[in-house]
Amino acid sequence: KELMYGWPIHLDDTPSRTIGQICAAARQLKAQHPDLALIGLDYIQLAQASTPEAKKKREQAVSEISRDLKLIARELDVAVVCLAQLNRECERRPNKRPMLADLRESGAIEQNADAVIMLYRDEYYNPDTVDRGIAEWLIRKNRGGATGKVRTLWEPENQRFSTLAENVMPTYGGGFTASPDEHDALAR
C-alpha cells in the first residue's frame, strides 16, 4: 500500500525477515524515496538475526538487530521507531509501570536506543481507578533531553491517543510537554 490516509506510507509485512533483509529493503526504499524519514518495526523480537552466532542465542540476536537498526538509521538519516515486548517482571511488582529493565531479551535495546518510551494504563490493572481512559507515556530514556511522564487520553474504540489539557505546558528538550507538577520538578 503506497498511500494510507493521504500519507506516503509503504507497508512491508513479509514474515520472518532477517535484520539484513530489513536493512536491504530500507536502503532500496530510501533509494526510491529520498525523502524517507521514518522506518517502523513491529516488533523487534520478531526480526531474525543475520549471523549464525546470533541465531543461536535470542539475546545475541536481539542485540545484533538493535545495533543494526541504529546503524541503518544513521546511514539513511532516518528515524527508526521499533516496538518491543516486555518481560513479565512488571506484572509481579506492586507498581506495574514498566521500567527499562523490563525490556525483553536484551539490555542492548536500552543501550542502542536514543529514546525509550513505555506506555502504562492504570485501568488495565485497576478497573476502578480514577484514571480510566488515561494513558501514561513514560519517557524512560532520552539521549536528547529530559525523561519524564506525559498523560494522554486513550480512546480504545478508535485506537487513538489525544492531548490532555494538563499537558499544554512548556516543551522540553525531548519535545514532550509536562504537567504542572512535572514542570515544577523539571525546573528545579
Predicted regions: what they are:
Residues D12-D13, C82-A84, L119-Y120:
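Conserved beta-strand segments of the P-loop GTPase G domain that flank and frequently precede/overlap
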Residues D13-G20, Q60-S63, L100:
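Conserved phosphate-coordination/catalytic loops
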Residues T14, K57-R58, P94-N95:
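A generic structural signal for short
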Residues P15-S16, Q45, L86-R88:
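Active-site-proximal loop/turn and secondary-structure-junction residues that shape catalytic pockets
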Residues K1-R17:
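Conserved P-loop NTPase mechanochemical-coupling segment
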Residues L36-C82:
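Helical hairpin unit composed of two closely spaced alpha helices linked by a short loop
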Residues L3, I19-L36, E53, R67-L76, ...:
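C-terminal regions of RecA-like/P-loop NTPase motor modules
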Residues L11, D42, V81, D114, ...:
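Residue-level signature of catalytic and energy-coupling elements of molecular machines
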